[in-house]
Amino acid sequence: MAAAVDTFLFTSESVNEGHPDKLCDQISDAVLDACLAQDPESKVACETCTKTNLVMVFGEITTKANVDYEKIVRQTCRDIGFVSADVGLDADNCKVLVNIEQQSPDIAQGVHGHLTRRPEEIGAGDQGHMFGYATDETPELMPLSHVLATKLGARLTEVRKNGTCPWLRPDGKTQVTVEYYNENGAMVPIRVHTVLISTQHDETVTNDEIAADLKEHVIKPVIPEKYLDEKTIFHLNPSGRFVIGGPHGDAGLTGRKIIIDTYGGWGAHGGGAFSGKDPTKVDRSGAYIARQAAKSIVAAGLARRCIVQISYAIGVPEPLSVFVDTYGTGKIPDKEILKIVKESFDFRPGMIAINLDLLKGGSRYLKTAAYGHFGRDDADFTWETVKPLKWEKPQA
């Protein structure tokens, strides 16, 4: 490629499952999973906050399920690796507070008529606007900067849990800067410019050992060699010390990592968080169907890059607006693609829940609560399934 091409730098970050905000996301979604597993009609809005030696779950839940909230909190913390005060939280001995009430009857009658409505009549649980995004720069049709930052975070956890790097502790953050060029609206990654990893560690390890292990066991297996060169910059634990972490280091709250959960700063975001919300909450289900729409457009070859916006009013099933922009990469005009999207996707919340099988609990939502909701290769991530679009391909 000619060196004269104008390039730019774009950065995405991620945090791994031991970050206090992500711990809260996972607890909120573990509660949602437990409710849906017993009662698929559960209405859940579960928030979590944490600080040293304390976790609190609070919100509105209406369910027939019999759920032991404290047990779920402790189990989720334990599974992440918070098993002693040294690492930032002791799952078995921390204080757990629960303040959960029923969903407001005013909201209930407006959204689902106290469970009397058919799925296609269920109204949106709130107002709001959501975005879905897709780009052809990676096989998962996600931005490379975001994919790499996310995979580095997941790999950090993997080498901690499998004993490869026994000095690791649960909390950690990653950030990747990619050099791109703009090919008529499509994003083409050229190289990785900077890799930043800050990970919690124990007292026994030196900064040199940390840097060597991170390069060998985390960066090398994750970032394809073709993107690294002698100019790539590495910042590995640049603060010099990160022993205190998890809720001991920082307070955590559900819904504070919404860009990490989505597209790493690419596309756009309507502001609504995902975790702890059942599918009548369009913050979540709307964003999931918008991703499926955008991904299906790019996968069908209709565009190289695409964003879809939808918006809702509380109690109203049909979206108020649907918007599509292909950044000039569309094979046909955007207004034609918009028509295809409207014919191919049912954006009513009750139908999204059925078509994407969103009423299923288990560990379904817990899995989404760390390492991103999109671009994941897992059958439970039903919104990642490419949907055949209803359109007449122009004859060659």
From Swiss-Prot:
K(+) binds at E47. It comes from the Eukaryota. GO terms for biological process: one-carbon metabolic process; S-adenosylmethionine biosynthetic process. It catalyses: L-methionine + ATP + H2O = S-adenosyl-L-methionine + phosphate + diphosphate. Signal peptide: none annotated. Binds 2 divalent ions per subunit. The metal ions interact primarily with the substrate. Can utilize magnesium, manganese or cobalt (in vitro). Binds 1 potassium ion per subunit. The potassium ion interacts primarily with the substrate. PROSITE patterns: ADOMET_SYNTHASE_1, ADOMET_SYNTHASE_2. L-methionine binds at E60, Q103, D250, K281. It is found in: Cytoplasm. One of its GO terms (molecular function) is methionine adenosyltransferase activity. Induction: By salt stress, in stems and leaves (at protein level). Follow a circadian regulation with higher levels in the light. Keywords: ATP-binding, Cobalt, Cytoplasm, Magnesium, Metal-binding, Nucleotide-binding, One-carbon metabolism, Potassium, Transferase. Mg(2+) binds at E13. Its cofactor is Mn(2+); Mg(2+); Co(2+); K(+). InterPro entries: ADOMET_SYNTHASE_CS, S-AdoMet_synt_C, S-AdoMet_synt_central, S-AdoMet_synt_N, S-AdoMet_synthetase, S-AdoMet_synthetase_sfam. Its EC number is 2.5.1.6. Gene3D superfamilies: 3.30.300.10. Catalyzes the formation of S-adenosylmethionine from methionine and ATP. The reaction comprises two steps that are both catalyzed by the same enzyme: formation of S-adenosylmethionine (AdoMet) and triphosphate, and subsequent hydrolysis of the triphosphate. May be involved in the synthesis of betain in response to abiotic stress such as high salinity. HAMAP family: S_AdoMet_synth1. Belongs to the AdoMet synthase family. PANTHER family: S-ADENOSYLMETHIONINE SYNTHETASE (PTHR11964). Homotetramer. This is S-adenosylmethionine synthase 3. The gene is SAMS3.
